[in-house]
């Protein structure tokens, strides 16, 4: 073998070794590049998912807040209209006190209460419009004093002086009690319900 052949053989061998090493280096570089790429994709995918979850939570929170606000607004509106009904009913008391049933009821209450008091002094409070009617019902009973209360719309309050007890038969109190007990039914009638 001559020198040139030997040199060619050596060069070919070195060339093959370099080629193999370059191929290995290229494979390693591609592997590192793919790993880096996958890591970056994974990190950003995780961040995007976290942002999506956070945004969904914010949206759900806002949705819940709006639902509560809507319910509160509806309740305020319902309360407004229920109070309007109450005001209208309260305005009708003037018509109620003109009826025979009202006068009969007051007479029955006074008769019953006066029978129970015997010798105790009582004061009956009534609206200015009812004073004459009450005085007529009481008659000449010296244990009963009739006084007016400008705040009363109708009905009576009986104050027992010895015991300090007051029995309230005022229409406003009765209306308040009935209205409070029927508030749910009134709401159902106005806004639908059960």
From Swiss-Prot:
Gene Ontology biological-process entries: proton motive force-driven plasma membrane ATP synthesis
Organism for this UniProt entry: Saccharolobus solfataricus (strain ATCC 35092 / DSM 1617 / JCM 11322 / P2)
SUPFAM superfamilies documented for this protein: V-type ATPase subunit E-like
Lineage: Archaea, Thermoproteota, Thermoprotei, Sulfolobales, Sulfolobaceae
Quaternary context: Has multiple subunits with at least A(3), B(3), C, D, E, F, H, I and proteolipid K(x).
Cellular compartments annotated: Cell membrane
Principal location: membrane
Keyword terms, alphabetized: ATP synthesis, Cell membrane, Hydrogen ion transport, Ion transport, Membrane, Transport
Cellular component GO terms held in the UniProt record: plasma membrane; proton-transporting two-sector ATPase complex, catalytic domain
Signal peptide: none
Gene3D superfamilies per UniProt: ATP synthase, E subunit, C-terminal
Keyword check for Oxidoreductase: no
Family membership noted in the UniProt record: Belongs to the V-ATPase E subunit family.
Pfam families: vATP-synt_E
Bilayer topology term: Peripheral membrane protein
Record's protein name: A-type ATP synthase subunit E
InterPro entries from the UniProt entry: ATPase_E_C (IPR038495), ATPase_V1_Esu (IPR002842)
